[in-house]
Curated annotation (Swiss-Prot):
UniProt keyword annotation of Phosphoprotein present: no
Family matches, as InterPro entries: ATP-NAD_kinase_N, ATP-NAD_kinase_PpnK-typ_C, NAD/diacylglycerol_kinase_sf, NADK
Active site per the UniProt annotation: D46
Localisation per UniProt entry: Cytoplasm
GO MF terms, alphabetically ordered: ATP binding; metal ion binding; NAD binding; NAD+ kinase activity
Catalytic activities: NAD(+) + ATP = ADP + NADP(+) + H(+)
Record-linked NCBIfam families: PRK04761.1
Protein's recorded name: NAD kinase
Organism for this UniProt entry: Mesorhizobium japonicum (strain LMG 29417 / CECT 9101 / MAFF 303099) (Mesorhizobium loti (strain MAFF 303099))
Length: 257
């Protein structure tokens, strides 16, 4: 991919390290507006990168992240030199977000996109009770739990992994359905679903056992039902250095201990 320095927009999180990197790189390579850019370089952590991907989704712009945050699993290593060459050699990965359609106890309908996961969790000390349907067929009549989520391959190494869900290769046509602290059924540990599946969560006893939902950082309180599917139209493009590709990161993560 050929990328001139004058077609790069630099954006950063609010941390001191990220702002310093923004100032340094803008002075060195120039600064293009996001609207006119071919590539957006995101400086920060994984959370800021997800925000940048959401902001540029559907525009055709490519996002290249450099780590000025903490973990930076989705980020490339920060180096100020040779940036245009690194971007030109980068491997592009297409990410399809999830679409969440949530209905609240007041009858409000809220839709949002999630690159990582759509998660539901109990709002109070009461255990959540949730019915799970896949493609209009009830698969779990009642899940008693702290929460449950649907994760994309891109999000499988985040909240999903911390809840003991599976790590998915980015090109796997799968979604991870993962419970959080399940109580009953005791032996149910989740499922792998086709990325073409539509999943519906119905909250049982919503007044007694209120549940919140979130598509990444978009939170909806007191939901009665949540429907999730992979978006058929929205896409985002993430760039990785070829020697540190997404598949290599996923493989390495599975051997960490």
């Amino acid at each position: 991919m050929s990328t001139a320095a004058n077609s790069i927009a630099f954006v950063s999180s609010d941390t001191a390290d990220a702002k310093a990197a923004l100032e340094s790189l803008s002075a060195r390579y120039g600064q293009c507006s996001v609207a006119e850019a071919v590539v957006v370089v995101a400086l920060g952590g994984d959370g800021f990168l997800l925000q940048t991907l959401r902001d540029t989704m559907g525009t055709g712009k490519k996002v290249y992240g450099m780590n000025r945050g903490t973990i930076g699993f989705l980020m490339n290593e920060y180096r100020s030199g040779g940036l245009t060459e690194r971007i030109a050699a980068a491997v592009a990965e297409t990410i399809r977000p999830l679409e969440m359609l949530a209905v609240t106890s007041e009858g409000e309908t809220v839709s949002a996109l999630a690159i990582n996961e759509v998660a539901l969790w109990r709002q109070s000390y009461q255990t959540a009770k949730i019915r799970i349907s896949v493609d209009d067929q009830i698969r779990l009549e009642e899940l008693s739990c702290d929460g449950v989520m649907i994760a994309t391959p891109a999000g499988s190494t985040a909240y999903n992994l911390s809840a003991h869900g599976p790590i998915l290769p980015l090109d796997a046509p799968l979604l991870a359905l993962t419970p959080v602290s399940p109580f009953r059924p005791r032996r149910w540990r989740g499922a792998l679903l086709s990325n073409k599946a539509t999943v519906r969560f119905d909250i049982l006893e919503p007044e007694k056992r209120p549940v919140n939902a979130a598509a990444d950082h978009t939170e909806v309180k007191a939901v009665t039902s949540v429907t999730v599917r992979e978006s058929p139209t929205a896409t985002a493009t993430l760039l990785f250095d070829p020697n540190h590709s997404w598949n290599e990161r996923i493989l390495a993560e599975q051997f960490r201990y």
